[in-house]
From Swiss-Prot:
Entry EC no(s): 1.2.4.1
Name by which UniProt lists this protein: Pyruvate dehydrogenase E1 component subunit alpha
The organism of origin for this protein: Rickettsia typhi (strain ATCC VR-144 / Wilmington)
Main function: The pyruvate dehydrogenase complex catalyzes the overall conversion of pyruvate to acetyl-CoA and CO(2). It contains multiple copies of three enzymatic components: pyruvate dehydrogenase (E1), dihydrolipoamide acetyltransferase (E2) and lipoamide dehydrogenase (E3).
GO terms for biological process, alphabetical: pyruvate decarboxylation to acetyl-CoA
Length: 326
């Protein structure tokens, strides 16, 4: 297969939905950063600010029954998978009402009813699991696929290639999405891997790979839709490398001194949220007042999430002895 340029384009309703989704993710992550600074969120906290177009486009393409798994930068993925933001924020704040009962925190978010399987803190560990999820779909004879997200740093992990080999050997319906935000923690791609075209990493296993502009919502939508169709019809893996960028540090404790202000500013000029907003206005899909109303509704969701989390109890001591399997 080859990705055809502009074969698919979002319709009006999809543009508006994705604008609302991206805005919700942006405001949610900004609030998380604020609460972390206030000491309301502890431990590790990895924000997704700047990368919103990637998951927003994928969620439009996903069909009911498809599954998602990702790394520790997972707030956006679980929210768009269907988990209410208040349960995600409660988890970040260590409350019993959180999606992982307050025991997982930022890096270990789960929502099995919505087929979101984590949230994994070990770099690359989710890739073999995502491959296993795809195996289950094939074994059970469904037409579902698994979207397995990983970062550019995870591509250097050995288990990733073991998973690639099994996925191609058994013909598994999995889309590996490499969110290449240029840095593995503080190490640039150019310093961490010899072959910088990460979408080619599956060639030895017969896996086709494609590179998309993760800052371009329309390109993400078009490319992901074609790839998902191929994987669903042929039950064979594909790798998507999406070139994106995080505006904040690797985590909240990272001042990101390894990159210049000019570099960050260059990427912010292509801010996906600003661009999709302008597309909507230029095509008269919505008015300025319509978009302001969406902003107000998003702010209300964030307000409710904060109030819910602050008023939720901490887990009881008995929870120390539940959900233990080894």
């Amino acid at each position: 297969m080859n990705i055809k340029p502009k074969k698919y384009k979002p319709i009006k309703e999809e543009y508006i939905k994705s604008f609302k989704d991206m805005l919700l993710l942006r405001r949610f992550e900004e609030k998380c950063g604020q609460l972390y600074g206030m000491g309301e969120i502890g431990g590790f906290c990895h924000l997704y600010i700047g990368q919103e177009a990637v998951i927003s486009a994928v969620e439009l393409i996903k069909k009911k029954g498809d599954s998602t798994i990702t790394s520790y930068r997972d707030h956006a993925h679980i929210i768009l998978a269907g988990t209410e933001p208040k349960y995600v924020l409660a988890e970040l704040m260590g409350r019993a009402t959180g999606c992982s009962k307050g025991k997982g925190g930022s890096m270990h978010l789960f929502d099995i009813p919505n087929k979101f399987y984590g949230g994994h803190g070990i770099v690359g560990a989710q890739v073999p699991i995502g491959t296993g999820l795809a195996f289950a779909e094939k074994y059970n004879g469904t037409n579902n696929i698994c979207f397995t997200f990983l970062g550019d740093g995870a591509v250097n992990q050995g288990q990733v290639y073991e998973a690639f080999n099994m996925a191609s050997l058994w013909g598994l319906p999995v889309v590996y999405i490499i969110e290449n935000n240029e840095y593995s923690m503080g190490t640039s791609v150019s310093r961490s891997t010899f072959m910088r075209d990460l979408y080619k990493k599956g060639e030895s296993f017969g896996i086709r790979g494609f590179q998309l502009d993760g800052m371009d919502f329309e390109e993400m939508y078009n490319g992901t839709k074609q790839v998902a169709e191929y994987v669903r019809e042929n039950s064979f893996p594909v790798i998507l490398e999406v070139k994106t960028y995080r505006y904040r540090g690797h985590s909240m404790s990272d001042p990101a001194k390894y990159r210049s202000k000019e570099e960050v500013a260059k990427y912010k000029e292509r801010d996906t949220l600003v661009r999709i907003r302008q597309i909507i206005l230029d095509n008269k899909y919505a008015t300025e007042e319509d978009l302001k109303a969406i902003e107000r509704s998003v702010q209300e969701v964030i307000k409710v999430a904060v109030e819910f989390s602050e008023n939720s109890p901490l887990p009881s001591e008995d929870e120390l002895y539940t959900d233990i399997y080894v």
